[in-house]
Amino acid sequence: MARMKARSAKGKRVAKDTWKSKVWYDIYTPQSFGGDVIGQTPANDPATLIGRISEISLRDLTNEHSKHMTRMYFKVDGVSGNNATSQFVGHDTTREYLKSQVRRRRSKINAIVDVRTKDGFKVRVKALVLTAVRARDHHKTEIRINMEQIIRHMAKETAFAEFVHAMLMGGLGSKIYGDCKKMFPLKRVEIFKSEVLEFGKAVEAPVEEPAAEEVAEAPAAETQE
């Protein structure tokens, strides 16, 4: 029994010493997101940091409470000293928030589009349109086609950093809302998920935040349930 306890104690000491040997690294966002620290992570070897994913809410990054439902993901792509750089690899929106936006007597129209930006990044974009009243099938088809065309065109005409800002901060959603509401009454537009499929040129430049909000709302009051 004494031997077993001694072995157990020795194992605990080894585990404790291993943890103490780890070094903490600060994870920074790309310069297009401010180059801010979004978290810390420990590692024995800095090489093991490459590829790690760090998550942060858009609210925490921008200090805008209305962005609480959006989560952003950054992958570590380099280490210098105790600092780790990262690249944006996608975002999503909480299920609870999306469910709360769906109402009866409205139609939900989804679009999933793989696009390539001006600087060669391939991105999968998932967008959602909610109509103000129930739409017929031909209206849904027309809106979906128009959504896909707008997303493809904006990606083709902009660099990756600018396109990401348009997705997250409202430029892309506002463009879809403005064009598609001419076809049918709309209530809401969400760019609810994205995923970077291929990386292009490593171009980083500060991007001005669009004035429009991420969520485009119709000026009229909601349809009574």
UniProtKB/Swiss-Prot annotation:
Q: Which GO terms describe its biological process?
A: translation
InterPro entries referenced in this protein's UniProt entry, alphabetically: Ribosomal_eS1, Ribosomal_eS1_arc, Ribosomal_eS1_CS
Segments for region (Disordered): 206-225
Instruction: Give residue spans, biased composition: Acidic residues.
Output: 206-216
Task: Spell out the protein name for this chain.
Answer: Small ribosomal subunit protein eS1
Fetch the NCBIfam families from UniProt: PRK04057.1
Q: Which UniProt keywords apply?
A: Ribonucleoprotein, Ribosomal protein
Which family, according to the similarity comment?
Belongs to the eukaryotic ribosomal protein eS1 family.
Q: Which Pfam families does this one have? A: Ribosomal_S3Ae
Task: Please provide, alphabetically and separated by semicolons, the GO molecular function terms listed in this UniProt record.
Answer: structural constituent of ribosome
The highest taxon in the source lineage is Archaea
Which cellular component terms (GO) are annotated to the entry?
ribonucleoprotein complex; ribosome
